């Protein structure tokens, strides 16, 4: 009986600890990604963004994405890849007006993903 109760408490503590870590990691990763995307958006508005700016953001995303796959479904992260690839294509061609909406979509997705997978009553029911 005592072992069962101890096992239940240990399991509960592990679940809570992993949940807190997951929320922290996802939120900080997307916060950092949003800040980087906002700087790219600003540079694109000024038409000073380069393809290299975009590839450095993609490198950041690729590094973080592998760990995010543990917490977030593949389809949510895949949409980020598609939008980033299109934005990079427009930056490569220096079509800044076409790149801006793609970066806006990336900013929107980066804002909604953490909220969709955060522990909250609206995500339970």
Residues covered by each model-derived region:
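Structured, soluble extracytoplasmic/luminal domains of envelope-associated proteins
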Residues: 75-125
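Short, solvent-exposed, charged loop/turn and helix-capping segments
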Residues: 60-78
